A protein has these predicted regions:
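Ser/Thr- (and often Asn-) enriched beta-sheet segments in non-cytosolic proteins
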Residues: 2, 8-10, 34-36, 235, ...
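Predominantly extracellular beta-rich ligand-binding scaffolds that present long acidic/polar faces
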Residues: 13, 28-29, 36-44, 48-184
């Protein structure tokens, strides 16, 4: 995995690129894990494998009792493009194992699959989201991107494979990025992702409008790499140093204004 976590972790405004060598982008392992993954891009965990693979080509894996909130991310290109060999639990944007849990809101997922023949519901392989655990999935865009297929075979690509999860209010459509071919993932003016994310005000965009689905939605991240556009406090002066209970105290701050 590019990031392996066994404790609490918050990931904001990051990019995890698989460099076309399979593997897993973010691996959340164990009941001590309480993770928040937001405003990030996880992509290109892919292979052209002739042999058997097991739990490969996965954007985010939540396992062994871990829990995660996955909000306003882009997850794509998690796939095995050659149908030779057996692919087990592989080719997933998000994979949640039994006993683990996740809230998945406001994300755009596409191009996660395996090129093989489907072997039945007890061994699902190739899906944007696969959950054997407790998952709440809402207000995402699940895009059936047209995959490239090497060496023939049948492409296994579905939006969601679920056992104990609930999926609601998601959009099955092209998200209409500004220029996907040049990695400009801002939203075009007619994108169905605009104002279509989770409606709870805690997820609102920085301008106060409803959450936009995708990595630029919400108010926790500013695209130039900062996490706030408000003044930043650099120091505090308190006088007097000691006062009786209920006595007055003056606090002066020094800081900087973000430009």
């Amino acid at each position: 995995a590019r990031l392996y976590a066994q404790n609490q972790v918050t990931i904001t405004g990051c990019e995890f690129e698989g460099n076309n060598d399979g593997g897993i982008g973010i691996d959340l392992d164990g009941s001590s894990v309480k993770a928040l993954i937001q405003n990030s891009r996880i992509h290109s965990y892919k292979l052209d494998s002739l042999g058997d693979i097991n739990q490969e080509c996965i954007g985010i894996r939540v396992r062994n009792g871990a829990s995660a909130r996955i909000v306003n991310n882009l997850i794509h290109g998690c796939k095995d493009r050659i149908h030779n060999g057996n692919e087990t639990n592989s080719g997933f944007g998000i994979f949640i194992t039994s006993g683990s849990s996740a809230f998945i809101h406001g994300n755009i997922l596409w191009d996660c699959y395996v090129s093989r023949y489907y072997t039945g519901p007890e061994n699902p392989t190739g899906a944007l989201i696969c959950s054997f655990g407790q998952a709440t999935i809402s207000h995402n865009i699940l895009w059936q991107f047209t995959p490239d297929i090497y060496e023939g075979g049948h492409t296994r690509e579905v939006q969601i494979t679920l056992k104990e999860a609930q999926a609601t209010h998601s959009i099955l459509a092209d998200p209409k990025f500004t220029d996907i071919n040049n990695s400009d993932f801002t939203l075009a003016s007619d994108s169905p992702a605009i104002n279509a994310g989770p409606p709870d005000p805690q997820y609102n965009d920085r301008d106060g409008s409803r959450n936009d689905i995708g990595m630029f939605g919400g108010h926790n991240f500013i695209p130039d790499g900062r996490t706030t556009n408000k003044p930043i406090v650099l120091g505090l002066d308190v006088a007097p140093i000691a006062v009786p209970t209920g006595g007055p105290v003056t606090i002066e701050s020094t800081g900087a204004t973000v430009k």
